[in-house]
Structure formats: C-alpha cells, structure tokens
C-alpha cells in the first residue's frame, strides 16, 4: 500500500474512534474533507487548534468554556441554591438545551462500577462539590445521572457521601427508561423527569 493510502487509513481510523462513528461514517467524513481539502481541512484544523488552545474546564462545575469560570456559573440569575449532578458535559448541555433547569451543575466526568477503585472515586471531584455546597449554602442536590446500572450506583455513592449535609437530595424520576441517557432524551421527557423528581428516601 502506498504511503498516501496509509495516511488516509490512519485518518479514517482516528475518526472511527469518535463516539457514534464507525468505519463507514469515518470514510464518508474523510472523503468529504478531501473533496475541498484546501478549505475544509484547513478550517477544521484551525477550529481544532482554537479549541485546544482556548477551551478549558470550569473550575467550579466542570463545564467547558473559554474562561476558568463558565458562563453558567458566572450568570447572576442562576439559582445558586440548587445543583444538578450530571455524568458528563454532554448531559449538562442536554439540560441547558431543554431549558428545564436554572440552577448550577456539577459534572462528575465518569461513573462508578462495582469494581471502581479509589482513583475512580477521587475523579468525581466530590470534595470540590462539598466545598461549594457549604460556601454557597446550597439547599438541594438533584441527581441527574443516567438511568444505567453504573449511573444508579454512582447516584447512591453520592447520596452516601453527602448524607451528613443538611440537604434535600432528589433524583430524576418518570419518563427516563432503564439504560436511558440524558443526551438522547427530548425536552418533554426531561421536563417530566424534573417535575416528578423523587427524594432519595423514596429510592
């Protein structure tokens, strides 16, 4: 195989590693870029370089922004008495698109499983969450983890971690099917889940 072919195959392989893409979709993307490579590839390269150099994780919640405190955490009209705990930035963005939540967020970054060790637990940044709860006198925590086994396990771990705090802890309820992920739910389903959220005592 020619060297140029190897380069293209490596690019296809890289795209195929992205969530939601397989080899067929990756090939289509590469062929699309190659149809006008001087413009399309240069534009993509510039955009990726800009993201690499400018986008960072919010010091407070874990969202992505061009500054260390994201627009949501800076917004004076957000309800600082309530924090929704989500698994990923994708879930945070899904809730923002739905416009069903006007409080703050905490992005866990991952979930726990039955074999998770201390490194996985520490990566959830729960001490940072606890400091924020105490500093801003947060009154309610909404567990907006996905309805998967790992999501449920993570939710129960967070409940146990915060059990000594004077907090209302609730969890998204009806409308989210077992195994469902927030990023794939429509606005009506998310709204129903927020309105029908349950106290952790009922879980």
UniProtKB/Swiss-Prot annotation:
Protein keywords: DNA damage, DNA recombination, DNA repair, Metal-binding, Zinc, Zinc-finger
User: What processes does the entry annotate via GO biological process terms?
Assistant: DNA recombination; DNA repair
User: Looking at the record's lineage, which domain of life comes first?
Assistant: Bacteria
What PANTHER family does its record include?
A: RECOMBINATION PROTEIN RECR
Query: What GO MF terms are annotated?
Result: DNA binding; zinc ion binding
InterPro entries membership: DNA_Rcmb_RecR (IPR000093), Rcmb_RecR (IPR023627), Rcmb_RecR_Znf (IPR015967), TOPRIM_dom (IPR006171), TOPRIM_RecR (IPR034137)
Q: Which CDD domains match?
A: TOPRIM_recR
Annotated Toprim domain ranges read 81-177
Record-linked Pfam families = RecR_C, RecR_HhH, Toprim_4
| Known role | May play a role in DNA repair. It seems to be involved in an RecBC-independent recombinational process of DNA repair. It may act with RecF and RecO.
ZnF (C4-type) residues: 58-73
Q: Does the keyword NAD apply?
A: no
Family assignment?
Belongs to the RecR family.
Descriptive protein name: Recombination protein RecR
